[in-house]
Amino acid sequence: MAYIEGNTGKWEYVIGLEIHAQISSKSKLFSGSSTIFAANPNSQVSYVDAAMPGMLPVLNKHCVHQAIKTGLGLKAKINKYSVFDRKNYFYADLPQGYQISQFYYPIVQNGTMEIPTSTGDLKTIRINRLHLEQDAGKSMHDQSPHYSFIDLNRAGIGLMEIVTEPDISSPEEAAEFVKKLRNLLRYIGSCDGDMEKGSMRCDANISVRRSGEPLGTRCEIKNINSIRNIIKAIEFEAKRQVDLLESGEEIIQETRLFNADSGETRTMRLKEEALDYRYFPDPDLLPLVISDELINELKANLPELPDQKIEKYTKEFSLSKYDAEVIVADESVAEYFEKAANECNPKMLTNWLTSELFGQLNKASIGINECKITPSNFAKLVKLIENDTISGKIAKTVFEIMFETGKAPDKIIEEKGLVQVSDNNVLNTVIDEVIAENPESVEGYRSGKDKLFGFFVGQVMKKTDGKANPTLVNQLLKEKLSS
């Protein structure tokens, strides 16, 4: 449990999240308009999106399937009967004068997700609901000193709003939840999770209280657009509320915005209640009825999800839970790992993957899908180390060439003459030379200066251009120096 340190004692965080995830779909929720990001303004707007008189919405079946799959991934109840409602409010970039959403009967309810806590335990976060709704357009106020401009490309794009219960007890837990949810959506393929492009946005409902007291008055922070800012926004807002309460003031229930530059929240508007939106069923859309057959079909076609992969990696490949989580955090990395792990030692592969390959990818600012090293060639490199064909030091040289060229490791070793020397006779000859050339060091070592052993190893490696098998060198040197 994390606390906010006030002047009069400790306060608890109480946090609930609302995640707006843009559905991965080529067309909008109720029209056939394209959803391509960053298209020319108002180039992806149908008569339905612009709310022209007489235009009727037609539900996108693919978006419904994406919501069902997400609900299944969240271990939630898929409601076989759900209804679309009109959420009535006026805004310039909402041409209908209302948003089509699901208030009374959402498509998904009662899910859960487990997140790691600071103590290393798992904590279950309850998910109240997932409902479908359409996005609004975009108002632009910086194009002219006299006018605001409206871009309706985004109007009507399908969203899944995923709402948690107030089970989150720290800014770090909130960040963990969003990271894990984003990864789940990416594995399912229902949302790309790109917060920078606005395809995943987070609202945080925050209140504070003394331990054991009832829930306090909450404020909602809108449209937080990064994991880092989720932590910053919650920390600032909770401290602001504590300062007000400790000075005898009341918390006003309101909607606030987070300024990433100043790290502060500011008032946007007073918080509305459901009655303010005058929800009622949309008369242009029939209730959505979902069959058991459809649910079972979508469930059968779900990919292997992150938690399932972590369990598989720890059991089948004997990886640590930490290593498994690192690999599973990126679906492309997990796919790469599995292709390579079938051909070599998974543990050794993991070490090279998370250190050498990740390091080079970060340095080059590219993803694993852009890497020139194929999973098969990466596995070959690991096997060459495993069977002592090359040393770890030589392997790093080979790896760097592989990363630059994409060549197979055995071809590089052949071209560069980098095969590891593991012949006892050859190594004994080199060791004899090193001992003969350094009599004083030999005497020092035999008189108890054990640190000199590293000097002898270094000399052998130098004479063999780093190609000597280090394990064998250690063994043979100890035998020679102790005789």
Curated annotation (Swiss-Prot):
Its EC number is 6.3.5.-. GO terms for biological process: glutaminyl-tRNAGln biosynthesis via transamidation; translation. Belongs to the GatB/GatE family. GatB subfamily. It comes from the Bacteria. Allows the formation of correctly charged Asn-tRNA(Asn) or Gln-tRNA(Gln) through the transamidation of misacylated Asp-tRNA(Asn) or Glu-tRNA(Gln) in organisms which lack either or both of asparaginyl-tRNA or glutaminyl-tRNA synthetases. The reaction takes place in the presence of glutamine and ATP through an activated phospho-Asp-tRNA(Asn) or phospho-Glu-tRNA(Gln). InterPro entries: Asn/Gln-tRNA_amidoTrfase_suB/E (IPR017959), Asn/Gln-tRNA_Trfase_suB/E_cat (IPR006075), Asn/Gln_amidotransferase (IPR018027), Asn/Gln_tRNA_amidoTrase-B-like (IPR003789), GatB (IPR004413), GatB_C_1 (IPR042114), GatB_Yqey_C_2 (IPR023168), Gln-tRNA_amidoTrfase_suB_CS (IPR017958). The keyword ATP-binding applies. It holds the Pfam family GatB_Yqey. The keyword Ubl conjugation does not apply. Heterotrimer of A, B and C subunits. Keywords: ATP-binding, Ligase, Nucleotide-binding, Protein biosynthesis. It comes from Rickettsia rickettsii (strain Iowa). It catalyses: L-glutamyl-tRNA(Gln) + L-glutamine + ATP + H2O = L-glutaminyl-tRNA(Gln) + L-glutamate + ADP + phosphate + H(+); L-aspartyl-tRNA(Asn) + L-glutamine + ATP + H2O = L-asparaginyl-tRNA(Asn) + L-glutamate + ADP + phosphate + 2 H(+). GO terms for molecular function: asparaginyl-tRNA synthase (glutamine-hydrolyzing) activity; ATP binding; glutaminyl-tRNA synthase (glutamine-hydrolyzing) activity. Gene3D superfamilies: 1.10.10.410, GatB domain, N-terminal subdomain. This is Aspartyl/glutamyl-tRNA(Asn/Gln) amidotransferase subunit B.
